Amino acid sequence: MLDEAAYFLLGNIKIYYYGLHNALGALAAVIVLALCCRARRMPAGTAPLYAVLAMPLGVACSRVLFCLLDGRFRGIFSLRAMLCFWGGGHSMVGALLGAALAAVIAAKILAVPARRMLDMMVPALLMFIAFARVGEQYTEMLGRSRALVSEVWRQGWLVAGDEYALYLKTYVLEALCALILAAALLPGLLRGGRDGDTLLSAMLLLGCTQVLWESLRFDAHMRESFVSLQMLLYAVMFAAALLVFACRYARRLRHGWPVWLALGVIALTAGGVIGLEFMIDRSGVSRFVLYAPYVLLLALPAVCGFVFKKRSNLA
C-alpha cells in the first residue's frame, strides 16, 4: 500500500487497514457464495473452487487494467513495476472482470451453465465491494469528493475534513449502494429465475450507480482530464446489459425497435453525462443543480433495461 495509508504492526509486519478490509471482503464473499450455492443446490465444492480461481485472477486483472489505463503509471511503466502490486494501484472494474473469468472457468470445470455461475457470484462480489469501499477511509486520497464549498455540508456523518477543506465520504455511499443492490438482487437469484438475469440486472444497476459515484469521487485514480476512466468502463457495463435486454425483447417481438431505442438511450445518456461532467469540472454552476439531471439521465437506461427484461421474460 501507499506510504500515506494507515497501518498497524503485527510483530515486524505492516498490516494495512485497506488491505485488511479487502481480505475480509474476500472472506465474506466466499461465505455468501457458499450460502447461495447451498440454497441453489450447486455442485459440492463450488465456493472453494471459485475462491481459488477468483482471488489470483481478480488481483491480476485489477492490476493489469490499472497499469494500462492510469495516466500516472505510464511514466514508470515496466513489467517490474506492474508486478509490484502490493504497493497500491488497482482497478475495481478489473477485479470484477477477473472474478467473472473465474466464474466461467469454474462453470466449465463443474459442468454447470456459465450464466448460472455468473449469477451466483453477484451477491458475493457486491459484498466484497462494500468491504473494499469501507477500507478506503484508511487511505489519504481514495473515496472522497471534491472540496465542498456549500455551507450545507459543514456538518454531517457523510463529511470528512483535513486542514485544507471538507470532503464528501463517497466510500460510504458506494458501500451502502453495494449492500442495497445485494439485498435487492438476492431474492431473484434464490428463486431461480432465468439464468443470466441476475448478472445482467447487476451490471445495469451497478453500472448506472457507479457512474454517479465515480463522478463524485475526486481522488485522481485513473482519471484523464475531467473524466474518470473507470466511469467509462462502468458505462460500458450498463450499456452492454441494456443492449442484451433490448435484443431479447426484439427477438420476442420479431421487431428491431427495442434495440434502436436502447442505442438512442445510451447515446443520450452518454452525451448528457459528458456535458454535465464538463460543467461540473469547469463551470461555476451549483453542483446541486447539475447533479439533478445527472441522476435522471442515469435512471433512464436502468428503467428501460428493466422494462425490456420484464417484457422479454413474459410467457
Predicted regions and their residues:
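A feature for loop-to-transmembrane-helix boundaries and adjacent hydrophobic helices
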Residues: 1-315
